[in-house]
């Protein structure tokens, strides 16, 4: 069996690690995996792909510099020919597609191919995310009537996504699956020792430092807690250069609220084990309807409760005041109240952390179920 894994992004984040974990499972179980990655992939991504057969493609994504619109158009035309010729020559049994954008701009090559198309969906359909009525109106018709029909197997990473896909026009052909993310196995390369001014409960955030992830709201919640005399620290792991203007805004909040002794930015880290061991509670304060985050299952595996907002797909696997805190109100005040709960009830940290770990098995989030489900997707024809 030959599987082409589409990897059209250029750098390593949660979604990319999650897809590479699937490649690893398939390869370990006798499937031949060829990864079609971007010609603009970073050295870090290329290094992660060392153990796979690879093929570079000119994907119309993450292009930078002048004349970007022309570059996108050029690559869109290129990829139609590149992918069509490659699929015709190699005839893979399956193609694993990780994003709706890739599914859309590769529709023509897929349409003329006999390969089984597996779409791993971890985001809201674009028909929900785009605000332009003209775009949404036209695209929703193409999506429902044409693009979705070429998907043979839909793999959703949350019930939330399954429902959204059904609402957008998906009709299950009998092979669609719900597979929650298993935290990708990371290479725990030792970083410098995490330096933290530990003062009370240590909250942690790990991920992309961008507005939708709620880091600003997290710092504002920290400010409220400090004014109220609470003792706590916050450890933030992630690359601040992803959105420099946003990072500058965060630094200003820290300075203006005298949080220098409470907040620690440690940058992008490899040694995630040390990060989780240093933290007591993990904060995942996404302010948009995030379908799922790898960090939820990852925090469970390290016996850590997490704080989330009651939206998107994450409440499916976090039980309020049992394995974490589910905050109904998406607000700074709601977040600060949840954090204050752990500060005032430190015994709950260990208790809920243990329940979080046990819930991995109860919710079938363990690795054996993850492997079995993915192998059932890629069956011999």
What do the PLM-derived regions correspond to, one by one?
Residues 43-48, 161, 166-167, 235-260, ...:
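Short, structured helix-loop element that forms part of the nucleotide-activated donor/catalytic region
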Residues 305-308, 318:
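Short hydrophobic beta-strand element within catalytic cores of glycosyltransferases
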